């Protein structure tokens, strides 16, 4: 959230197409505002040299399994959106104020957040966990095609047990010892499951 005070950060703007994106980035480069596209810090950005989409919105996962689950989730969402785009479907676009508000709510309250359900446009906020579960159900066929269905199920495991941040808060609240929190982070980070 602190980073959002900088230019070229936060939710990305909507572009008509890749040429529109390239023109904007080119203007920033030609004017000397940025050295290259890596100086754009949107929550989601293209990495043209690698041909990838970088999702830069969530905290680093301390558990390898969580990082893999988040990657599987992002891959399946991108695959779903690409297929919809290629089929000529309208891709939903939400006002930056609304997406920024949801970002704030989840940064502040984590998996306990209640957010605006932008896809259904419900009037009341809903638990973010419900939105995540629905999205997992929608993207599971895409994860299956990518060979990452099992990894995607890790998202549901995170919802069941809590995130790395939840675990860190639990440890700190139990003994008020930041060293124990650091130890937990180190232990979780060093433990590499055999299946990954």
How should each PLM-predicted stretch be described?
Residues 3-196:
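C-terminal accessory/tail domains of diverse enzymes
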């Amino acid at each position: 959230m602190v980073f959002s005070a900088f230019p070229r950060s936060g939710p990305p703007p909507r572009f008509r197409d890749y040429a529109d994106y390239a023109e904007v980035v080119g203007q920033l480069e030609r004017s000397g505002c940025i050295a290259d596209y890596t100086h754009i810090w949107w929550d989601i950005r293209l990495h043209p040299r690698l041909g990838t989409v970088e999702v830069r919105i969530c905290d680093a996962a301390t558990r390898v399994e969580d990082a893999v689950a988040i990657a599987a989730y992002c891959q399946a969402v991108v695959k779903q959106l690409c297929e919809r785009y290629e089929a000529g479907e309208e891709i939903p676009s939400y006002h930056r104020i609304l997406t920024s508000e949801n970002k704030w709510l989840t940064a502040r309250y984590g998996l306990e957040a209640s957010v605006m359900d932008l896809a259904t446009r419900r009037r009341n906020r809903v638990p973010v966990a419900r939105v995540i579960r629905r999205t997992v159900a929608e993207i599971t066929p895409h994860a299956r095609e990518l060979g990452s269905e099992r990894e995607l199920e890790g998202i549901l495991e995170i919802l069941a047990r809590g995130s790395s941040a939840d675990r860190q808060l639990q440890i700190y609240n139990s003994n008020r010892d930041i060293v124990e929190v650091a130890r937990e982070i180190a232990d979780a980070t060093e433990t590499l499951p055999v299946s990954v």
